[in-house]
Amino acid sequence: MLAKRPKRLLSALRAAFRIVLFLSPFLFGFLPPALAIETIAEQAFLIDMTTGEVLFEKNADQPMAPASMSKMMTAYMIFERLRDGSLTLEDTFTVSENAWRKGGAKSGGSTMFLEPGKRVKLEDLLRGIIVQSGNDACIVVAEALASSEAAFAEKMTVRAKELGLQNTVFKNATGWPDPEHLTTAQDLALLAKRTITDFAEYYHYYAEKEFTYNTIRQINRNPLLYKNIDVDGLKTGHTVESEYGLTASATNGDRRLILVVNGLATKKDRSREPERLLNWGFRDFNNYRLFSAGEEVTEADVWLGKEDKVPLVIEREMLLTIARNARHKMKVTVTFENPIPAPIAKGDPVAKLVLTVPGRDKLEVPLLAGAAVERLGLFGRLGTALKAILWGESG
């Protein structure tokens, strides 16, 4: 086996990057152990949405009460029905006595202040859910789309599982405390990502800072919308049991981070801690496109082939999340049998891109033959064998 440094890689990484590499579905993601940050949140999960790289996590798979962050799923269910045409923003729904009693002002929870018996446009209800965090608005929609709020919550759970939220169970549409109403920080981050990618046309509601309904003006409880860090969503949550939580997304250039925190003691903590974690994620990391899909990494010698060389290409785009202080530790090589015997079919896996970082297992990316190489005929093979014997040539 021969270990070769790819010529394209050497020129691109002349400064000997120590990189954090993400693979999706075969690009890798890893962070060197030296990178560390602490948080006062009980649960936290921070990812780069473009690469999927996990930048930080704390108890990310620990079951937790999501409180009003549950409403992201309620809104997602509405978005799906708007997309398939079964609902329109102009549709109206009647406020039931149940929705008023369970979600209105007397309930003690966040509310849109809906009046029983009144018909309300869906777009107003949607803003009531997202901007005002109205429990009454959630219940009105749940009762309209299912036989009851409980039945709607069952549909929410089923759909959440289909989206990949494997550790999430909804018992209501609002996030009202229930011992079985649980999720994880990682699941909420996935839901946020799906919301942003699946429903770009509706995502703007999460960035709205206020909404006035029935002459009552309420501001969005997301404190990061009022800070200069380009946050454009998503949802806060708070109960006595879960304390203060937030699912947030922010952009910086062509990067987007998603952060989930929960179990913060005060509103002030919910304002400061997410801002600190997001700033860290943008400041200490960057994304780097190493190879495009189908790009040639290097070439290899061919034995007994009609061509002397075969290009080695990477099948899919390789996008890196680089930790700025994780440089000067990474080694990148390409390994393959040298020379590679013909015949070679285009697309055959014939080499490996090997990435090593101190303290981590070796990570390997397959490289494919970028062209077909036919085997020489009998006389050609004899001539090649003779040259190899007499002069040591292997072409």
Regions found by a protein language model. Give the residues of each.
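Short regulatory "switch" loops immediately downstream of catalytic or recognition motifs
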Residues: M1, F22, A99-G103
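Active-site-adjacent loops and short helices of periplasmic peptidoglycan-processing enzymes
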Residues: A34-Q186, K193-T197, F211-N214
